[in-house]
Amino acid sequence: MVVSEEGKWPEEERWERYTSDKISRLLNTFPGVQNIKTNWSQSMQDMFVLTMHYGKRNGTYLEIGADQPRIINNTYLLESEFDWTGVSLEFDSDKVEFFNSVRKNKCICHDATTFDYVNLFEERNYPKQIDYLSLDIEPPEQTLKALSRMPHDVRFSVITFETDLYDTLRRNDGKSQVQSKSEEILLSYGYQRVVKNVASQGQPYEDWWIDPTVIDPHIVQKFVLSLCSYGHINYPYSNDMKIEGARCIIR
């Protein structure tokens, strides 16, 4: 792989990745993890998804805000190593063209806040229970709009939602309206937040959710207890809580 082809390779200190030599440091394992050489998400979202699904193969996803096809992408590992299928959305046409030259699962160039998701799911015969929803566009208010457009009769087993809380804190605006509104929406649909304020370089920017009606509660409990046992988080959540994404996966 030519790094310069994407121009997005972060400095090593800004991107802690899982690599196969860290397998003994995993807080939780799953079938197939021994075959993973490295992950690709910014904060190990891909590893979180696989942990919650216990290494599920042939899963389904919807990715809102694809950006790059591999570097800091939440679905490349799922597609390339676990045979997941899905579709990504991206507003930048140049990024979409490059994405589609690299990936098997394709990316659509469209505004995620006006896109017809009902038609997409019908055309592609998506199941009513989709395994993963990744929501990450700029600014976070747009991410919230995209969430609001999701069909009510379709559920997602795992959701990663970018709040960009650090930006709110930087502006001293107090509580993030995007975070509180997304909480309101997802809680009203019966979703459960597993990790609040996932951070990168100390900057909290994302919340991780699951559908408790389909994700094994024993997996969730084990995941949460492993975080608590290493002092990474405390329950109940405090308003100033944050946790580096990598600490959710490796000790």
Enumerate the language-model features and the residues they cover.
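Conserved acidic-Pro-Pro-aromatic motif
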Residues: 76-77, 82-85, 128-135, 139-250
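Helix N-cap/coil-helix junction residues
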Residues: 54, 91, 126-127, 154
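Short secondary-structure transition/capping segments
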Residues: 98-101, 120, 206-213
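Short amphipathic alpha-helices and their capping/turn segments at secondary-structure boundaries
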Residues: 50-51, 122, 146-151
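Juxtamembrane luminal stem/stalk of type II transmembrane Golgi/ER carbohydrate-processing enzymes
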Residues: 1-44, 224-251
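Internal catalytic-core helix/loop-beta-alpha segment
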Residues: 107-137, 141-142
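Short, charged, surface-exposed secondary-structure boundary motifs
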Residues: 98, 117-120, 168-174
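SAM cofactor-binding core of SAM-dependent methyltransferases
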Residues: 33-118
